């Protein structure tokens, strides 16, 4: 079967070249992979076409800018239907209203439809890969399969991380346990635990991932502990072990709000969640941390040295009144940066162009005013190559190069929007 596609005459964005003046080139795609990039690929005598039949399809790219598909490196599909539901709220209050523990178990047709709706919005905005920390509560493999089947139906690339916790977020709200017994806090958060009492939740998740790995070329997996402080301390080294054995990333939330840092100062080794993760063996290139708003410079440097990935959710953090991540300090340390649009109920849109703009503009009015904010090319890199690294797909997506998967976006240069 000849499924070759030739895109002729597009301006092709190369972040390692002249990103301000992209060169005009053709892109030859075979079997979903970029076979060649360069001028003259429409000529059957071109060396890159040797031994190949004529492309089955040819697209005119002359009024298009070809960019790598964007990577939404932090996303939750479980609240797609809550878009626009809330005015700005503090994170700890929003946690009690917007997340699956706060509402009854959803029917499977709703799971399918909300997954499709979220995927469609992402695709329409140029996002071709999502890192979905999706919470199925209570954890049910039949529900999980419904979500994965919806992603297959949508045709978007997904790194799926079952989102789980072992303690409610109320337990990690500073000093709340001094007022309310811990046994009652699950009621305050709206639901019983994800897993039955005494059940090994991580073992169930590992088994579910192992059984489904390799079933579909667009679906890979990660582990999704809600936050280091929202699982038991003895579970953290086990998460590191499962990640190493399966060779998959760990997605989690870090220092999203002031309250999280206050809790860490009182309850964590050395007063730091980063130190807690280090002692558990989690600090490595497979660790992907969302938010990172209230990290210290020393913590940022430690994460950068370990090769961890920092995903910034610049828009969602405004609506949850969490603050602005210290982007300039992160860039100074050489930290690996990626971007995400986070929950639909706190960002209201899966739009990485909004996030890229905020990544460049918010640091312009925060931190040291004499230090320049990141340029646009750095935002694009974080949304493509940085995102690919963060979700475990480095070298496969995130750039327009031979050998990479052909996850591309063609932007219409004649469209004034």
Residue spans for each PLM region:
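N-terminal metal-binding scaffold of metallo-dependent hydrolase/deaminase domains
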Residues: 1-52, 64-65
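Divalent metal-coordination and catalytic microenvironments
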Residues: 10, 27, 32, 63, ...
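Alpha-helical scaffold segments that flank or form the walls of functional sites
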Residues: 83-157, 200-216
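Conserved short loop/turn motifs at secondary-structure junctions
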Residues: 133-140, 224-229, 318
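Metal-coordinating catalytic core of metallo-dependent amide/deamination hydrolases
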Residues: 142-290
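Histidine/acidic-residue-rich catalytic or RNA/ligand-binding cores of hydrolases
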Residues: 170-174, 258-270, 299-304, 321-330, ...
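His/Asp/Glu-enriched, well-ordered alpha-helical/loop segment
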Residues: 279-286, 328-415
């Amino acid at each position: 079967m000849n499924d070759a596609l030739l895109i002729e005459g597009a301006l092709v964005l190369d972040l390692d070249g002249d990103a301000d003046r992209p060169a005009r080139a053709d892109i030859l795609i075979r079997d979903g992979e970029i076979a060649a990039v360069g001028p003259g690929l429409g000529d059957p005598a071109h060396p890159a076409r040797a031994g190949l039949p004529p492309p089955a399809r040819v697209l005119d790219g002359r009024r298009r800018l070809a960019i790598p598909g964007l990577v939404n490196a932090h996303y939750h599909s479980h609240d797609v239907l809550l878009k626009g539901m809330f005015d700005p709220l503090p994170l700890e209050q929003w946690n009690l209203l917007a997340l699956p523990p706060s509402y009854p178990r959803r029917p499977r047709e709703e799971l399918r439809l909300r997954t499709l709706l979220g995927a469609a919005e992402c695709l329409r905005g140029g996002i071709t890969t999502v890192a979905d920390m999706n919470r199925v509560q209570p954890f049910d493999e039949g529900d999980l399969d419904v979500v994965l089947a919806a992603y297959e139906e949508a045709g978007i690339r997904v790194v799926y991380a079952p989102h789980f916790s072992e303690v409610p977020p109320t337990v990690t709200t500073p000093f709340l346990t001094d007022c309310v017994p811990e046994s009652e806090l699950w009621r305050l958060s709206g639901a019983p635990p994800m897993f039955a009492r005494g059940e090994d939740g991580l073992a169930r998740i590992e088994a579910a991932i192992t059984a489904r790995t390799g079933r579909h070329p667009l679906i890979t997996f990660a582990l999704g502990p809600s936050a280091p402080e929202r699982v038991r301390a003895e579970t953290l080294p086990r998460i590191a072990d499962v990640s190493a054995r399966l060779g998959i990333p760990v997605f989690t939330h870090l220092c999203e709000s002031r309250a999280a840092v206050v809790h860490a100062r009182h309850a964590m080794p050395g007063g730091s969640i980063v130190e807690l993760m280090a002692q558990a063996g989690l600090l490595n290139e497979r660790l992907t941390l969302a938010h990172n708003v209230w990290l210290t410079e020393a913590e940022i440097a430690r994460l950068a040295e370990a090769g961890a990935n920092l995903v910034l959710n610049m828009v969602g953090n405004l609506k949850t009144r969490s603050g602005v991540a210290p982007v300039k300090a992160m860039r100074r340390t050489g930290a690996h940066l990626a971007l995400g649009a986070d929950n639909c109920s706190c960002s209201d849109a899966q739009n990485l162009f909004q996030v890229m703009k905020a990544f460049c503009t918010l640091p312009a009015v925060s931190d040291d005013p004499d230090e320049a904010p990141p340029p646009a090319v750095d935002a694009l890199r974080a949304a493509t190559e940085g995102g690919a690294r963060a979700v475990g797909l480095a070298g496969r997506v995130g750039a327009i190069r031979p050998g990479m998967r052909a996850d591309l976006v063609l932007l219409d240069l004649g469209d004034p929007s």
